Amino acid sequence: MAQILLHGTLHVTIYEVDNLQKEGGGHFFSKIKEHVEETIGFGKGTPAIYATVDLEKARVGRTRKIKNEPNNPRWYESFHIYCAHMASNVIFTVKDDNPIGATLIGRAYVPVEELLEGEEIDKWVEILDREMNPIAEGSKIHVKLQFFDVSRDPNWERGIRSSKYPGVPYTFFAQRTGCRVSLYQDAHVPDNFIPKIPLSGGKYYEPHRCWEDIFDAIINAKHLIYITGWSVYTEITLVRDSRRQKPGGDITLGELLKKKASEGVKVLMLVWDDRTSVGLLKKDGLMATHDQETEQFFQGTEVNCVLCPRNPDDGGSIVQSLQIGTMFTHHQKIVVVDSELPSGESEKRRILSFVGGIDLCDGRYDTPFHSLFRTLDTAHHDDFHQPNFPDGAITKGGPREPWHDIHSRLEGPIAWDVLFNFEQRWRKQGGKDVLVNFRELDDIIIPPSPVMHLDDSETWNVQLFRSIDEGAAFGFPETPEDAAKAGLVSGXDNIIDRSIQDAYIHAIRRAKNFIYIENQYFLGSSYDWQSDDIKVEDIGALHVIPKELALKIVSKIEAGERFTVYVVVPMWPEGIPESASVQAILDWQRRTMEMMYKHIVQALNAKGIEEDPRNYLTFFCIGNREVKKSGAYEPSETPEPDSDYIRAQEARRFMIYVHSKMMIVDDEYIIVGSANINQRSMDGARDSEIAMGAYQPHHLATREPARGQIHGFRMALWYEHLGMLDETFLHPESEECVSKVNRMADKYWDLYSSESLERDLPGHLLRYPIGVASEGDVTELPGAEHFPDTKARVLGTKSDYLPPILTT
């Protein structure tokens, strides 16, 4: 049967299976011993029956296990599934769970073509065995399905049409109005760095300074300071700009938090407990998180610092529990404090929150200059970060690894949602009940309330999103029905918040003109990768974001409209670039890019358009190269001969590490958070994540392009990366703009990768060093099989021993 594109939303309810019993009352399960799937088995106990929903080989839903109804398991579970899949059938698979793996009972098939009209289908479907014969007693599964094609969505390709836009549906947190958002590029921006960027209403864009604002927020807190991090390092200082000194600004973060706790402020910290401190990836030179040092630093003080492992929920198999506990992380980066009211008039306090990609740890402080060598005796002398060489050290000199990142400050009702997320996590894993009791502070801390009038042109609407499950958050509903009402997804006896992925999908589907992405990773939609040398069903990077982007571009090509997607990623994921894990991730990235380009090339060919697919989808990395100046820092040692380190030092170049997790749509909507574009971050049951999606209702791209704070922020980022601003940048979807940006990035790549260098690189944005062949295959650039100064393949290498769950 031919496969058909299902692009939209599929509502599915799985009710029950009848008659799992053979004639004469004998137990059905004795019949299926020979059909054991993926089972080592510890001896069978009570049958635990569950059902899954698959679109061909992509698993898109799973029920809980039913233990005491082996003959007639009843689930009555509903699923809200975002699809971007080619499929001929929606497949319902019924299995019996084992401690390791599961036993196949059978599969039921509903042809996709029955769904295309959008009618509700409610029926009993025959369950078949592997040979497509009915299983014993003609057992059936009762299901209900209804498909809503994306083109019927009132928001499809129409952007945010008014301030009445209610936010992303089916989520745990509702959208909040009357908020204020501050957007941060990098940990610090020096004075006078950003040129005049005009906004609507005769205003100009003003940059904010992340670590200075966090320093001020901590210093001024009187009741609470709550912090979560993948890493928190006590030895860093937050204020380092000699032109912008603050009283007490030279204090380390650890001493600052101890000082605040001694003043009676409740300081609570949840820091990821890195169980792989001795694990699989250690040899790849991945950065230590300092979790043990941080815990020891605060022992015996009034700071409550809890090392927090990524514990699985209780419902998984033995294998799943091992995977979650050792492979996945707590990745949220938040700070929540009490703060004075904006007017500063009364003694009352409010809640203020920070959310984004920047951990409060070493290696994160940087400015848009991203110097490799020139800050080694100043801002980075005591904070030298270079984990891409096995022996990177300040004593051996640069290049250090510069760090580009994005963060946000949230004020108004949205700040309380971030607080509630912290409280849920603390109640689950924090141990002692030492959270601030807000009832006792009723007369001091005001309840959630707007900080901006709704008719103020600078007001924001903001919504909080997460990837997290009940293994990491307290108080999730216990039944699938209640979970669905709360905007959560039920899995294998696990309740999951997967709203970050949902937010990306909704934003991409709404997009009208362009999308700008900065992310540390870019891989996914593995169900649509080419399967020449892999079994795609074994990869499991099933989130749909790359496929949604490709389908958006295709829909615009078919409609004869311009649309451009810009993606900025690091040259390679942090670590030794030749190592197996880094090479495996680059291989997944290449497959993801190739899947997207193949769709674009097919759409262009179908319309008879001869155009470079990079005019529709274009990938960049960022890097720097600096000539040597007199009086520069001189290291006392030299790196190993014939190493990546010495080659990079002599060529005076290195990548700028892109750690951002951001997407801007049409200059009107922005997502900022901790979540990467990979399965770990988007899954919900793997790494824990947090993000916010926001827009200014008075600055929408309805009749003319949006020119609010999001536009100003994007232009500031483009100025940082390109070293200049241009009129064409006002219309990123235009062929003039994408051609200019691609030309500049090509030129900067040539300068970056050339043998010699006359002067500093004029801009940082580099073409990602790949080519796109006529059929959409991703190829090496001539002479660029390896990244400069390394022996690491740009296109990556498939790993034969690292499990995909680790690298996707």
From Swiss-Prot:
It is an enzyme of class 3 (hydrolase). Disulfide bonds: none annotated. PROSITE patterns: C2, PLD. Residues 1-125 form the C2 domain. Its EC number is 3.1.4.4. GO terms for biological process: phosphatidylcholine metabolic process; phospholipid catabolic process. One of its GO terms (molecular function) is phospholipase D activity. The active site is at H331, K333, D338, H659, K661, D666. Residues 326-364, 654-681 form the PLD phosphodiesterase domain. Its cofactor is Ca(2+). A 1,2-diacyl-sn-glycero-3-phosphate binds at H331, Q520, H659. InterPro entries: C2_dom, C2_domain_sf, PLipase_D/transphosphatidylase, PLipase_D_C, PLipase_D_fam, PLipase_D_pln. GO terms for cellular component: plasma membrane. Transmembrane segments: none annotated. Ca(2+) binds at D186, H370, H404, E720. It catalyses: a 1,2-diacyl-sn-glycero-3-phosphocholine + H2O = a 1,2-diacyl-sn-glycero-3-phosphate + choline + H(+). CDD domains: C2_plant_PLD. Hydrolyzes glycerol-phospholipids at the terminal phosphodiesteric bond. Plays an important role in various cellular processes. C2 domain is a calcium-binding fold, and the binding promotes the protein association with membranes. A lower affinity toward calcium can be anticipated for PLD alpha due to the absence of two potential calcium ligands. Belongs to the phospholipase D family. C2-PLD subfamily. This is Phospholipase D alpha 1. The gene is PLD1.
